[in-house]
Amino acid sequence: MKVWDLHCDTLSELRRAEKNGTPASFAHNDLHIDLEKLQAGDYMLQCLAAFVNLADPTPGVDPLVTALEEIDVFKRIMAKYPDRIAPVYTAADIRKNAEAGKISGLLTVEEGGCCKGSLGVLRRMYELGVRMMTLTWNHDNELAAPQANPGGPLAAQTQRGLTETGFAFLAEMERLHMIVDVSHLSDRGFWDIVEHGTRPFAASHSNCRALCPHTRNLTDAMIRALAEKGGIAGLNYYAAFLDTDPAHPEACRSTVERIAEHAAHYKQVGGIGVLALGSDFDGIDGHHQLETAADMPLLADALRRAGFTEDEVERIFWRNARDFFEHNL
């Protein structure tokens, strides 16, 4: 079964290892994702995010520099292993890699604040290969409010959404065909995208709030709106986004059966076409039944046991995402 994953934080972990003087190989490492694991899991495409924490306490840290350094990690990986993985910028690139038996690497950004409110920087990100970006992570920025209170508990910021600059970014991202990713965005920000956006968008790594009352997840109304817009949502494997007690994530469970339950709810509310995978690998901690990218057959089997047909499992694993990017890159 082919796999298409909308989100991971592996670039950030590789950059961190380099900064710590213990560089890790992308061919084989102790992370959730490396080339060996991707090939063992039969991956067709992996979205690799340049992740930025605007509250990074490191002295002198610059969010734009952080993003550029992680993009540099991406570029070096693609140059080092050209026979096994290759970057993609268009739908044609994805088809070409599939025909050549190569994994596709699609560059994304997690935290639009790294652009510092500059449309020029946004356009430069596109030129560097970024094809999808979240407007926020867990901190307010020039573009929008997130689903988190910095230094406090996660809470839906229902009255604060996109800023004037955020709306300008939305328009420019749509012009460029850089996919808008609403994961981490506030509830009000989500509806700003629905009401003002003109193109399909993604929630790359978000689950169902009806099953797990965490503001990182989507309400049923959001799922329906996402589906009506032709968008897509990636199932996140993080226990606190799957189970029912976000205040005590250590008590939550990340099992393939629980992921399948979220998949079933997505299907019931938004239809099978809205579903994809968004692991959040290398950005999540705790115990997960899907320990690495090589374990994806476990999820396929769980979906079958939950009553999904073989056609539906394929759609969740790769075909819905393939069709979405085919029409929106």
Enumerate the predicted regions with their spans:
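Histidine/acidic residue-rich metal-binding segments in metalloenzymes
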Residues: 117-127, 149-202, 215-229, 257-275
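Structural preference for beta-strand elements that scaffold enzyme active sites
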Residues: 2-5, 45, 86, 104-108, ...
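Mid-to-C-terminal alpha-helical segments outside catalytic/metal-binding sites
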Residues: 291-329
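Active-site beta-loop-alpha junctions enriched in small/polar residues
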Residues: 9-11, 51, 90, 110-112, ...
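Short acidic/histidine-rich active-site segments
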Residues: 236-237, 270-293
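Conserved, mostly hydrophobic/aromatic
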Residues: 7, 38, 90, 129, ...
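A metal-dependent hydrolase metal-coordination microenvironment
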Residues: 30-32, 36-123, 138-175, 188-191
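Short catalytic helix/loop segments, enriched in acidic residues and glycine
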Residues: 19-40, 298-300
